[in-house]
């Protein structure tokens, strides 16, 4: 992460998983801008992956999430 980027905590929902982690945004950028600019995959750091039943199935310092599988992405305010 460069000094110009800031971490934003997000929740990502796919058909199978709830993913919590951080995306790295340029100053002034929105989550919407991040999604528009993403290619096939988006980098997420400090990740927790949960199944839809609420069971945590993995943690990882980094994952690439397929943009095509993202149904909802929202800032995590919890």
Where would I find each of the regions flagged by the language model?
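Conserved RNA-binding domains used in RNP assembly and mRNA/RNA metabolism
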Residues: 1-78
